[in-house]
Curated annotation (Swiss-Prot):
Any GO MF annotation of the entry: NAD binding
UniProt pathway: Amino-acid biosynthesis; L-arginine biosynthesis; N(2)-acetyl-L-ornithine from L-glutamate: step 3/4
Record's GO cellular component terms: cytoplasm
Protein name per its UniProtKB record: N-acetyl-gamma-glutamyl-phosphate reductase
Gene: argC
HAMAP family registered for this protein in UniProt: ArgC_type1 (MF_00150)
Root EC class: oxidoreductase
Keywords: Amino-acid biosynthesis, Arginine biosynthesis, Cytoplasm, NADP, Oxidoreductase
Length: 351
């Protein structure tokens, strides 16, 4: 399978090269970029060996179609929409790591991503409706048959996987869900940003995007799909001074206040028993982002507050792997008819 990595020098593209370069099932046949076009891979990343040392080409639909069966679009929001229809028409399957196709309505995307909507004049509501949300734990079968996959955001991944068993089976109320998440600075991408400068975020912890963070609506859309009911929740993200990693704490009210921590742990473990990358920890063992760094795993823990019938679910992921490119590779594996974790059996070099 020939794979194009478009946006190769961003964090998503770098992870894609690292994850695919030694995978015998795939060949990196095209690297695309704009600012970096005309340079070799080794010119940009001499510390990441790529045997073929591909030339990074100017992004071109025709060139991608000539050289690849599947395109991983590791691009800023809005840009993917300028390429996707042309690629699909030429028979290239698309896995988009941006938010361009995560919503089933183009109008909703335009409302949430209003700045990008002003810059990119889109008319592809049909593709928004066609795209499959690329969270394998929810859409496994649909992903395997799709030609356009919208890979989820990192925060939604860290929240929806732990919520899924409880919402889909009606174990928690649809109201009163609270998600408190903390992310490393790489979640903001590779472009310079004052907020992520070491002197700005080092030795500090800060919340941002309260109420109106873009991922709130993405989480609500999928949570509503899972539960079959409209869900409105509270989501508060925080920036923490580390490069990679994400920790989410999710609160919900149990419909059966008699459920214990052990009961809820069994619910999680049974639901995800066929997913080797999901590790449900024993009761009273709480996960650390260090445990999943540089892996595609998600670690979950659950605790019930019997005083008030609330459940607390903890999740940790590497925001650049399971929260981004590793998940895109899982989607690539599914559309290629391969095991979901092919090429993702990575070792965490603890500590």
């Amino acid at each position: 399978m020939n794979v194009a990595i478009v946006g190769a020098t961003g964090y998503g593209g770098i992870q894609a090269v690292n994850l695919l370069k030694s995978n015998k099932n795939y060949k990196i046949s095209y690297l695309g970029g704009n600012k970096s076009s005309g340079t070799k891979w080794s010119d940009n990343f001499p510390f990441i060996n790529l045997e073929s040392d591909n030339l990074i080409e100017k992004i071109s639909i025709d060139r991608i179609a000539d050289k690849a069966n599947v395109a991983l679009l590791c691009l800023p929001n809005g840009i993917s929409s300028t390429l996707t229809r042309g690629l699909l028409e030429k028979g290239v399957k698309v896995i988009d790591l941006s938010a361009d196709y995560r919503y089933k309505s183009l109008d909703q995307w335009k409302n949430i991503y209003s700045n990008e909507a002003k810059k990119y004049k889109r008319d592809d509501d049909d593709l928004c409706k066609e795209a499959v949300y690329g969270l394998p734990e929810i859409n496994f079968n649909d992903i395997s048959k799709a030609r356009l996959i919208a890979s989820p955001g990192c925060y939604p991944t860290s929240a929806l996987i732990p919520l899924n068993p409880f919402l889909s089976q009606g174990i928690i109320d649809n109201e009163g869900i609270v998600i408190d998440s903390k992310s490393g600075t790489s979640g903001g991408g590779r472009e310079p940003n004052q907020k992520s400068l070491f002197s700005e975020c080092g030795d500090g912890l800060s919340a941002y995007g309260l109420i109106n963070h873009r991922h709130t609506s993405e989480i609500e859309q999928i949570a509503s799909f899972i539960s079959g009911n409209d869900i409105e929740l509270l989501f508060t993200p925080h920036l923490i001074p580390m490069t990679r990693g994400m920790h989410s704490t999710i609160y919900g009210r149990l419909r059966d206040p008699g459920l214990t921590s052990s009961d809820c742990r069994i619910i999680l473990e049974n639901y995800y028993r066929n997913y080797s990358h999901i590790r449900v920890l024993p009761v009273d063992i709480y996960p650390s982002t260090k445990w999943v760094k540089n892996t595609n795993e998600i670690h979950l823990s659950v605790k019930v507050d019997t005083r008030n019938g609330r459940v607390i679910i903890l999740s940790v992921i590497d925001n650049l792997i399971k929260g981004q490119t590793g998940q895109a590779i899982q989607n690539l594996n599914l559309i290629s008819g391969l095991p979901i974790n092919n090429g993702l059996e990575m070792i965490n070099h603890y500590p």
